[in-house]
C-alpha cells in the first residue's frame, strides 16, 4: 500500500514538473519568436535608410554630418546582438532618422519629391510595425519572467537555470 502511494506521489510530481517545464519552454520560445519579429522590422527600417539618405543627399548636401551619423548608427545596430546595447543604438538611430526626415522642412524641393514622400510613409509604417512587435515581445518577456518568479514554476526554472529575458524599449 505504501509503495503504491509513493509511486503515485512520484508520478504526480513528475507530471507536475513536465507540465511546468513545457510551459517554460513555450514561453521562452514565444519570447524568442517575438524578438525575431522585432528584428525583422528593424531590418526593414535599416533597408529603407540608404534610400532615405540618397533622397536627402540629392537636395540637402549641407547635412553631411547628419547623414554620416545615420549611416554609422545603422552599421552599429546591425552588428549588435545584445538587446540592451542594441536598444540604445536603435533609439539613437530612430532619433537621427526623425531628424533626417525633419530636414525636408528646410528643402521645399525635397519635401515635394514623390520618392521622398513615399519613403517617409514607408518609414512611418515600419516604425508602427516596430512598436507593435515591441509590445508583443515585451508581453512575452513579461510572461516568461513572471513564470520564472512565480511559485511553483520558479523551482523548475531555477533548477534548469532559466534567465530573465530583457525588455526592449524604444520611444513611441
Which ranges hold each PLM region?
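A helix-centric hydrophobic-segment signal that preferentially recognizes long
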Residues: 1-172
Amino acid at each position: 500500500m505504501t509503495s503504491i502511494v509513493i509511486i503515485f506521489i512520484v508520478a504526480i510530481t513528475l507530471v507536475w514538473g513536465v507540465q511546468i517545464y513545457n510551459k517554460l519552454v513555450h514561453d521562452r520560445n514565444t519570447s524568442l519568436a517575438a524578438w525575431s519579429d522585432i528584428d525583422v522590422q528593424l531590418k526593414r527600417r535599416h533597408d529603407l535608410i540608404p534610400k532615405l539618405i540618397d533622397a536627402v543627399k540629392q537636395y540637402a548636401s549641407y547635412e553631411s554630418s547628419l547623414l554620416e551619423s545615420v549611416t554609422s548608427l545603422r552599421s552599429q545596430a546591425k552588428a549588435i546582438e545584445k538587446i540592451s546595447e542594441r536598444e540604445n543604438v536603435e533609439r539613437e538611430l530612430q532619433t537621427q532618422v526623425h531628424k533626417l526626415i525633419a530636414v525636408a522642412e528646410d528643402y521645399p524641393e525635397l519635401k515635394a519629391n514623390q520618392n521622398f514622400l513615399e519613403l517617409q510613409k514607408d518609414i512611418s509604417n515600419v516604425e508602427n510595425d516596430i512598436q507593435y512587435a515591441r509590445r508583443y515581445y515585451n508581453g512575452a518577456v513579461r510572461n516568461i519572467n513572471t513564470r520564472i518568479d512565480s511559485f511553483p514554476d520558479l523551482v523548475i526554472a531555477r533548477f534548469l537555470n532559466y534567465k530573465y529575458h530583457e525588455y526592449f524599449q524604444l520611444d513611441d
